[in-house]
Amino acid sequence: MKFTLLNILCLILLASCSTSRPIKSNLTTKYIRSDWPHWSDRDKNCLDTRAEILKQRSLVEVSMNKKGCKVRAGKWKDYYYPEIHNLASKVDIDHLIPLKHAHETGASQWSTSQKEKFANDPENLVITNRSYNRQKGAKGIDEWLPLHKDYSCKYIADWIRLKTKYHLTIRPTEKQSIDSLKRDCRF
């Protein structure tokens, strides 16, 4: 098997998960979704984060509404399953690590600015079918995985990378799931 830089980095992250001890989350506040500003238009070009993601990730040129601020159609690969989507109204932009989960694993004390950065981080945003997003909800990696193995392995690697990037706790049950699943994934 040929190893890419991403594969090697994922292996390093997986190895560190096996030996590191999870840190207890200091959850002192209740999760309130409105405390996490999302779909921001930080560059003030009338395209919010959702529109930016749809435009950037389309496999074809997108069609926009008359004002040019909302994406109508394009061609997107689903992150969780081997499907292609063509209508923007039929897809969700999902937070790979759900906002509520981040809140419960170390982000509860973040500033509003830090929460906004996380909620709009393209690395944590994926395109998927609405029903898959609803099935996943705020579940962690120990409660939900894509059914398709190839997609599960990428999901695990991205989950670990984002947890590491944002210094979020990997719960003991997550670690157990990661340890058992990484044997099936070829990193």
Please name every model-derived segment.
Residues 25, 59-73:
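A charge-rich, low-complexity, intrinsically flexible signal that marks solvent-exposed coils, linkers
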Residues 71, 76-187:
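Domain-level detector of nuclease and nuclease-like folds
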Residues 20-47, 174:
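N-terminal module-boundary/linker segments of secreted carbohydrate-active enzymes
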Residues 2-10:
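Sec-dependent signal peptide recognition
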Residues 43-44, 52-55, 59:
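Extracytoplasmic c-type cytochrome modules immediately beyond a signal peptide or single-pass transmembrane anchor
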Residues 15-16:
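C-terminal motif of bacterial Sec signal peptides marking the signal peptidase cleavage site
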